[in-house]
């Protein structure tokens, strides 16, 4: 039976999300590079794996799936007996589900815009829009205020142990720590300690 394959780009935050999950679970996999600058993600054969033309795509033998958060949840459930537990049970699982929604709808869209403006645009020879950065930082600050309160109650966002909720934030945070937006994390003591914790995990270091 064929093993696990991840089709993506190493700089993609969504791809990194999946790779971190696999490293957390100590699961072997094959990484298949999809070159975004050549538009490979919009052509066959990749488009057959994800018709929306976005990385990553994932295969576990005959099982195929896309969308990074769906993939990480599959990994966490399918390999629950391996590596670190990224889930919980009962009411705590509902807290994890809520946290995943908050990260997906509140944290990631804003964080990704800030990564685009401050990291990716300069790489492409484009100019950072400072007005957009200011607007998005104001939005991110509100999300981080919620996180700061939550982290004052528990070590991690959904539990006293590291879960998918924390994992999903890592790729965007890794990029933002190299930008002036880092100040928003540093200004909040609980958030700052949490960021230092999750970004220093071996799984996170492996995707840099």
Swiss-Prot record:
Q: Would you tell me the protein name for this molecule?
A: Glutathione S-transferase F6
GO biological process per UniProt: defense response; response to cadmium ion; response to oxidative stress; response to water deprivation; toxin catabolic process
Q: Which PANTHER family match?
A: GLUTATHIONE S-TRANSFERASE F6-RELATED, GLUTATHIONE S-TRANSFERASE RHO
**PROSITE patterns reported in the protein's UniProt record:** GST_CTER, GST_NTER
EC numbers for this chain: 2.5.1.18
Q: From which source organism is this entry?
A: Arabidopsis thaliana (Mouse-ear cress)
This protein's major location comes to cytoplasm
The reaction(s) catalysed by this protein are:
RX + glutathione = an S-substituted glutathione + a halide anion + H(+)
Q: Give a GO molecular function annotation for the protein.
A: cobalt ion binding
The cross-references to Pfam families, in alphabetical order and at most eight, read:
GST_C (PF00043), GST_N (PF02798)
Gene assigned in the entry? GSTF6
Q: Tell me which residues make up the GST C-terminal domain.
A: 89-208
Location comes to: Cytoplasm, Cytosol
Please report which protein family the annotation says this sequence is part of. Answer: Belongs to the GST superfamily. Phi family.
UniProt KW GTP-binding keyword: no
Description of what induces expression: By dehydration stress, salicylic acid, ethylene, methyl jasmonate, auxin, H(2)O(2), copper, metolachlor, and the pathogens P.syringae and Hyaloperonospora parasitica. Induced by cadmium.
Q: Does the keyword Cell inner membrane apply?
A: no
Instruction: Name residues in a coiled coil.
Output: none
The top EC class, named as a word, is transferase
